[in-house]
């Protein structure tokens, strides 16, 4: 995936986000049907997206690895997220989510890249970037989709919702091909 590809933010979130289990099954089965692979880069979800994928029978045919890049330094070192992007936009931004997708796709040479960054709380939120703000990106072929979400609940609820949203966005990206 070239870094010069189109990146945009979807204007409307999904009306309904299915469960992580259901979305993972849909994603793994579609990837298997079209003989493609997925890689992940996760921050606030801490591996939950990868765990949901590998919980599906047959995942080994479509999933090679994932990155957990919780701190900025890991995002930069492992995924190539620009220090300037991190400084200007912060780790919780559409720009960083897009660069995470580019970076993990390049590192793992997968067809589909899913990335998640956000604030799961309970601390760390601001008026501009409240707890529950999550950016999910999906890189497929020549484009990266970035979706902004505002989830509610405790830390685990926010992480679970972000996981389900990432898997659903990945599935949506494949269906839109």
Place the predicted regions along the sequence by residue.
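Short alpha-helical segments enriched in small residues
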Residues: 2-177
